[in-house]
Amino acid sequence: MPTVNQLIRKPRVAPVKRNKVPALQSNPQKRGVCTRVYTTTPKKPNSALRKVAKIRLTNGFEVIGYIPGEGHNLQEHSVVMIRGGRVKDLPGVRYHIIRGLLDTQGVKNRKQRRSKYGAKRPK
């Protein structure tokens, strides 16, 4: 524990709070247009082809968003809505695309956690 004199010489510095989703600019979601839809591979030790899209947002930011769920209909010039939320094993992917909104269709044949994937209630 430092003495009073030590604290006068070198005061305590609060850690800098860094924004994890700067492109949202304090908004819950942002709209954007897909400029490129592609797959990428995750970091070790995982192995897959993860579906991602490069998105030009309405505020001019260009970000990479993850496309959750099985199968999607996105292509270049699709209009999408993104939310915050990183993908731990994909470096640089800090946003998720919201399914079932704008040009993004919901996941077909989804029975559980439907609201997260924009799937309607099955009859």
From Swiss-Prot:
GO BP, sorted A to Z: translation
Entry-linked Pfam families: Ribosom_S12_S23 (PF00164)
Annotated InterPro entries: NA-bd_OB-fold (IPR012340), Ribosomal_uS12 (IPR006032), Ribosomal_uS12_bac (IPR005679)
Molecular function via GO: rRNA binding; structural constituent of ribosome; tRNA binding
Gene3D superfamilies on file: Nucleic acid-binding proteins
List of residues that carry 3-methylthioaspartic acid: D89
PROSITE patterns: RIBOSOMAL_S12
GO CC term, one of those recorded: small ribosomal subunit
Alphabetical keyword list: Methylation, Ribonucleoprotein, Ribosomal protein, RNA-binding, rRNA-binding, tRNA-binding
Function description: With S4 and S5 plays an important role in translational accuracy. Interacts with and stabilizes bases of the 16S rRNA that are involved in tRNA selection in the A site and with the mRNA backbone. Located at the interface of the 30S and 50S subunits, it traverses the body of the 30S subunit contacting proteins on the other side and probably holding the rRNA structure together. The combined cluster of proteins S8, S12 and S17 appears to hold together the shoulder and platform of the 30S subunit.
NCBIfam families, alphabetized: rpsL_bact (TIGR00981)
Protein name, per record: Small ribosomal subunit protein uS12
